[in-house]
């Protein structure tokens, strides 16, 4: 009979270890919520985030006027970025979400860059308002942000295998410690899935730990997937 080795109680349970999960955990902790962050691998050193690297940015208008980046191009406005994102999505994107992204992402992008600077990572700027950074550099930046917050409880190398429900409400999750083989039960008032995408659609791939856990758990719990 499989038994639960440890029960963890918290206000907010965040599942994942990359960009979405780390920034969600930081935001939760800043609101005063007791926050637990659970990752299948090492936080900031696993998943999609360290694989992609690449470009992170904002509109040039915000970069120049709000964050005082002298090299930025202020002629590339928020409206330009909004249109660019919608066009890239063949105008099928939820435009309310795109608008929210355009308005709120500059603050997050700049703060993550500051975390990276404190962690000794190199971000290369290019116009209109973008930075290039390696995937490893982005991971170290995110880890610095989580560590700076101080109050976030971390559980690494724990694979969440299912969500817990009470009626229609998700109340936590069960995970397996990948090195000890024991089960942990997490009970929370709120649960955030920030587990990234699904990579292994073929036997040979570059990111074998991206197995679609979050999407599968959400679907089994009754969520509608887009």
Report residues per predicted region.
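Short hydrophobic core segments
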Residues: 13-15, 185-196
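Phosphate-coordination loops involved in phosphoryl transfer and adenosine-cofactor binding
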Residues: 9-11, 157, 188
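Generic start-of-chain signal for non-secretory N-termini
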Residues: 1-11, 19
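N-terminal Rossmann-like FAD-binding beta1-loop-alpha1 element of flavoenzymes
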Residues: 12-37
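Conserved N-terminal/central alpha/beta ligand/cofactor-binding core
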Residues: 4-7, 27, 33-34, 40-182, ...
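Glycine-rich loop(s) and the adjacent beta-strand/alpha-helix scaffold that form part
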Residues: 190-226
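Hydrophobic residues within alpha-helices
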Residues: 24, 142, 214-217
